[in-house]
């Protein structure tokens, strides 16, 4: 199994276990059935996650794919509710007389709160999974998504529907390919992914610093720094990088699905389904924001 880049899956519950060793997760001994049989069972669960009834995780006290799917859906329900709040809050001051009064406060509160909670969840989940913190994270992410979506929609009407459909398409195709066994994570691909991720983070940091120090004056070509001001063969740099980042996010989803499947094979306690749902949300939110920015760059000043 290739290790996931998502910090939510750094917990031993989602790591491949060496024969004869028991992972130290909540002082619980995991199932000891053969790896091959467990792998087949986990694969069958994933393929039938949306068609089969609940696998009875309440009775077994173990993590299942179906239960993780239910937890993921519940987190996104919370996100959608608070996203509506963030959207309304962002546009509350906009009137025909003051069309420029778009508030970025929900966006900033959501981003900061989500980041802090993500760090807390990641570093405390090795000892205990706290669903309440994950619920709060989903709520803050909703404020962030609602705020940034309202702002982008104000600038580029119709962009939110485009980004949402594109995100759902990427997630759906990735899940279908993984469930069918046609796409799997590998150690080599994961190494390339990690290198690309580090490179992208460094580039993003440099881009933000340049924007902060006025390297790209207003009206110089776009609001995204190097992403919208530089071109390669006539194509905005942001489009080229954006496509690559969407592919990276899709592969990150594959790693997330693989980690959840590994947790099921390990017989992880049921509460770790919340951690799996949290990890999926982190990746999907990242994917949506990247697609939103990519479409904005493509649409330019239209």
Where are these regions (language model features)?
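A hydrophobic alpha-helical transmembrane-helix feature that marks the membrane cores
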Residues: 1-302
